[in-house]
Amino acid sequence: MQHQLVLQFRGSTLEDLDAIVALEERLTIHLAGVAKVDGHDIGSDEANIFIITSDPIGTFGAIRPVLDHANLLTGATVAYRPSSGNDYSVLWPAQSDEVFRVA
């Protein structure tokens, strides 16, 4: 089953388009053959990067060091949903009660 994994950055964490594109490129290389980076969007107070994967938990585990090395985990929320579903499960921050939405 395919899932959509979303990396969401709020506020000024990743508000620069060049920074989003650079992170997408790093993730594309890092996930080659494992998952597909499927683009991004930038809203008024958030930026999202979308990844298609059959293993969202494993994929997050694989990219977590990339995000941590770039000091992006602190301002990030990471969630996933089945490609055919609407309800997201939050992976990061751990034990989050936040209802996840993509604006």
Label the predicted regions.
Residues 85-103:
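Short, low-order "capping/linker" segments at domain edges
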Residues 69-86:
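Conserved short beta-strand edge segments in small beta-sheet-based binding/regulatory domains
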Residues 17-33:
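Short amphipathic alpha-helix segments
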Residues 12-16, 56-58:
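Short acidic, S/G/P-rich loop/turn micro-motifs used as interaction or catalytic elements
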Residues 33-66:
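Short, intrinsically disordered low-complexity segments
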